[in-house]
């Protein structure tokens, strides 16, 4: 498990979290 793999996993996790929060925020705005 190299540093590069750790960086890729970390970046992927941040991207997924950002997209998920953006979708939830958009759904909340549409629901109200």
UniProtKB/Swiss-Prot annotation:
Disulfide bonds listed in the record: none
Recorded family membership: Belongs to the archaeal flagellin family.
Task of the protein: Flagellin is the subunit protein which polymerizes to form the filaments of archaeal flagella.
Signal peptide start and end residues: none
Additional observations: There are 2 or 3 different flagellins in M.hungatei.
Domain of life: Archaea
Xref: Pfam families: Arch_flagellin
Gene Ontology MF term list: structural molecule activity
Localization of this protein: Archaeal flagellum
Protein name: 24 kDa flagellin
GO-annotated biological processes: archaeal or bacterial-type flagellum-dependent cell motility
InterPro entries, A to Z: Flagellin/pilin_N_arc, Flagellin_arc
UniProt PTM: Glycosylated.
Keywords, in A-Z order: Archaeal flagellum, Glycoprotein
């Amino acid at each position: 498990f190299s540093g590069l793999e750790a960086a890729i996993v970390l970046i992927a996790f941040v991207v997924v979290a950002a997209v998920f929060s953006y979708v939830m925020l958009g759904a909340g705005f549409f629901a109200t």
